[in-house]
Structure formats: C-alpha cells, structure tokens
C-alpha cells in the first residue's frame, strides 16, 4: 500500500467519523479532532514509508514482515531505553551533565516517531498553557533531574507542593509550572511534528539508495 492510498483511506475514515460525531449527541471539538487526525495521519504515513523502504531492501516478504515488526517494537519500547543509556553515558563517561545532558536526551527521545506521536497527543489532550511543557516532561522517568529539565530545558518554573498521603504522612511532590517564557521552539509541538515527518525523508533516502544499488 502506497503513502497516497493510505492518506486517502485515512482522510475518508476521519471524515466519516467526524460526520458521525457531528450528527450525534457527543460533544465534538473540531479543532482537537483535526489535530488528532493530523498527528495520526502523520504517524501512519511515516510507518508506511518505513515499511516500503524495508520491503525494497530485503529479499523476501517474510523478512520484510519481521524487519517491520522489529522496527516498530524498537521505536515503541527500546528507543526510550537507548536515549536513557546515552544520557547516562554523557554524564558518567563524558562528564556532560546539567542542562546540556537533558537537552540532548530529550532531543534523542523525540527522534522516535512513536514517542514523538505520543507526546504530541499528550500535549493535545492536556489543558492550559502548560500542556506542551508537561507533555515533554512526561517523557522522563522519576530518576531524571526534574528541576533542571523543567527550568533550564523547558523554561518552566520548578516548585514543590506538600501532599498528604496515607496515615497523615506528608511528602513533597515536584511540580513544573508555566514560566514567563514559552517552551523552546525546537521542543514545541510544531517542531516535534517536523521531527516525526522527517522519517519520511529518511525512508525515501533508503529507498532511493536501494533502487540505485539494484539498478547498478
């Protein structure tokens, strides 16, 4: 299936769904739905482009199926561990810490098409001016330096709030609030969407190289 046929199928599917929602009693947010369709369509086109490039690079359909499954699993479940490993390498072996370390780590995380799609959707369904920032921060585990990521990387205001737990025990919970500055453009939703679509170019380059190699 080509990218154009996938685009047509997605457009038809989203269009019919939109018509159903408009005609039903369900509250329909057209802007939110359009963003969801855009992000989902972008991811679908990327995965199709990658699948096509892989099918042209391997000798059989069975290998193509296995390779595509591996790529999806790698992007979805392994890439984040790779980014965390690079982060630890930067800090422990190369002595690169602080803001630069977490800038690079977040950028690597965003290069995964499935991870970039997830954080775009998280930002979309979030509320308020801080949704974009919290979506990026949500890509990190609790072991990360939340204060540096919030303040220096995402330009937010880091603070803590006292929360009461079980047995009247209290603990401090870190909070990243909106700051006077917006999230850096290179970590904003438009930039993340560009990173997602860039994989179409990568897949096209692989397909072109494969074609040239076979043609020779």
Can you say where each PLM-predicted feature lies in the sequence?
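Pore-lining and gate-forming transmembrane alpha-helices of multi-pass membrane transport proteins
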Residues: 36-40, 68, 72, 183-196
């Amino acid at each position: 299936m080509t990218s154009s046929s996938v685009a047509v199928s997605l457009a038809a599917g989203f269009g019919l769904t939109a018509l159903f929602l408009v005609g039903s009693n369900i509250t329909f947010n057209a802007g939110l739905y359009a963003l969801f369709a855009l992000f989902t369509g972008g991811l679908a086109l990327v995965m199709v482009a990658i699948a096509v490039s892989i099918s042209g690079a391997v000798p059989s359909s069975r290998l193509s199926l296995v390779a595509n499954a591996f790529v999806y699993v790698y992007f979805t479940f392994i890439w984040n561990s790779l980014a965390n490993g690079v982060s630890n390498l930067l800090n422990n072996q190369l002595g690169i810490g602080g803001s630069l370390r977490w800038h690079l780590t977040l950028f690597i995380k965003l290069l995964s098409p499935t991870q970039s799609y997830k954080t775009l959707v998280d930002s979309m369904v979030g509320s308020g001016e801080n949704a974009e920032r919290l979506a990026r921060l949500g890509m990190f585990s609790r072991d990360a330096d939340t204060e540096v990521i919030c303040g220096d990387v995402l330009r937010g205001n880091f603070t803590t709030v006292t929360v009461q737990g079980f047995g009247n025990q209290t603990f401090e919970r870190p909070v990243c609030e909106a700051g006077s500055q917006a999230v850096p453009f290179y970590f904003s939703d438009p930039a993340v969407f560009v990173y997602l679509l860039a994989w179409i170019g990568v897949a096209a380059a692989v397909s072109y190289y494969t074609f040239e190699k076979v043609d020779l």
